[in-house]
């Protein structure tokens, strides 16, 4: 029988990117880039966001791809943010169809129609990508933001560096804990609305909420993490790079209240699972953790 620690380590491993998934992500990046280059002047593209920071969870959805535009596309920079997104949307609809392409606040999402089975497996394939138009301004990037109607500054390298530093300061367990909570956040049991939006907000909060160093126990770390997230989800969480709008701006008061309730319930459910293990009920503890997280949490 799996010990609780063994189960968590197996769970962590299941949420990590493997070689086949990375290969498919690269193929999808090249596919979308090669097509968009027939429609726009693309200087280069690169995989970014949580995928590049190794904090992306499973199933592999909404992988960010920056498409850095050439100077020939500078006319977009002086227009409302929605203009370039509308044009990206129209171009991608031509290739993938309107049912597979949707506009988002700062990107265009392309769904590849990949089936997700009952165990959250996708045959190592990427479910969807987010195509993000961007301009390189020298020391940072600017991307369109429809909420403000403007181009906003961002620096994915700063985000990546902060995640790396946090991971190292937490005995190299920080990213695993973040992926676990993101996996919980993606659970279909929450309905159409994820508790925390964007999922990057979980990562931003973790920069402060996971503090004091790794305590050596996944179950207690996760319980404490959920509890602290619940306590602080109403706070304003600025961009860690100090450039763009607050990461927490996507959530209004009602959504934050719902998130707080669900995060608190998760911390309570974690406490129940811990109590099962403390009383020697290992099978019940594993089942409780699986009920909390979803099918990627192992029972054996």
Swiss-Prot record:
Catalytic activity, EC: 2.7.7.-, 2.7.7.85
Free-text remark on how the cofactor is bound: Crystallized with and without Mg-ATP.
Swiss-Prot/TrEMBL cofactor(s): Mn(2+)
Reaction catalysed by this enzyme: 3 ATP = 3',3',3'-c-tri-AMP + 3 diphosphate; GTP + 2 ATP = 3',3',3'-cAAG + 3 diphosphate; 2 ATP = 3',3'-c-di-AMP + 2 diphosphate
Annotated Mg(2+) binding sites: 62, 64, 130
A Pfam family per the record: SMODS
Regulation: Activated for cAAA synthesis by Cap7 (also called HORMA2) and by Cap7:Cap8 (HORMA2:HORMA3). Does not require dsDNA for activity. The CdnD:Cap7:Cap8 complex (also called CdnD:HORMA2:HORMA3) is deactivated by Cap6 (also called Trip13).
One BP term from GO: nucleotide metabolic process
Described function: Cyclic nucleotide synthase (second messenger synthase) of a CBASS antivirus system. CBASS (cyclic oligonucleotide-based antiphage signaling system) provides immunity against bacteriophage. The CD-NTase protein synthesizes cyclic nucleotides in response to infection; these serve as specific second messenger signals. The signals activate a diverse range of effectors, leading to bacterial cell death and thus abortive phage infection. A type III-C(AAA) CBASS system.
Subunit structure: Interacts individually with Cap7 and Cap8; forms CdnD:Cap7:Cap8 complexes with stoichiometries of 1:1:1 and 2:1:1.
UniProt name for this protein: Cyclic AMP-AMP-AMP synthase
């Amino acid at each position: 029988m799996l010990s609780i620690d063994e189960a968590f380590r197996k769970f962590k491993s299941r949420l990590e990117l493997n070689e086949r998934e990375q290969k498919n992500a690269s193929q999808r990046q090249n596919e979308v880039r090669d097509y968009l280059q027939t429609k726009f002047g693309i200087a280069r593209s690169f995989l970014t966001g949580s995928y590049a920071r190794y904090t992306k969870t499973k199933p592999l959805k909404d992988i960010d791809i920056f498409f850095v535009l050439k100077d020939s596309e500078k006319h977009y920079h002086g227009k409302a943010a929605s203009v370039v997104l509308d044009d990206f949307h129209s171009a991608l609809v031509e290739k993938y169809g309107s049912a597979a392409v949707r506009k988002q606040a700062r990107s265009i999402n392309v769904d590849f129609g990949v089936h997700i089975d009952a165990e959250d497996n996708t045959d190592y394939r990427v479910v969807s990508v987010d195509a993000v138009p961007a301009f390189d301004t020298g020391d940072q990037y600017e991307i369109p933001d429809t909420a403000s109607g403007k181009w906003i500054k961002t620096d994915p390298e700063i985000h990546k560096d902060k995640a790396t530093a946090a991971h190292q300061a937490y005995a190299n367990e920080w990213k695993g804990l973040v992926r676990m909570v993101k996996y919980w956040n993606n659970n279909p049991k929450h309905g159409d609305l994820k508790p925390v939006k964007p999922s990057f907000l979980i990562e931003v909060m973790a920069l402060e909420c996971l503090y004091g160093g790794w305590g050596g126990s996944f179950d207690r770390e996760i319980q404490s993490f959920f509890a602290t997230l619940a306590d602080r989800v109403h706070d304003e969480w600025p961009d860690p790079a100090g450039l763009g709008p607050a990461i927490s701006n996507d959530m209004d008061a009602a959504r934050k209240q719902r998130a707080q309730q669900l995060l608190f319930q998760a911390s309570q459910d974690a406490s129940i699972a811990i109590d099962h293990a403390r009383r020697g009920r290992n099978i019940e503890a594993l089942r409780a953790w699986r009920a909390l997280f979803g099918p990627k949490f192992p029972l054996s």
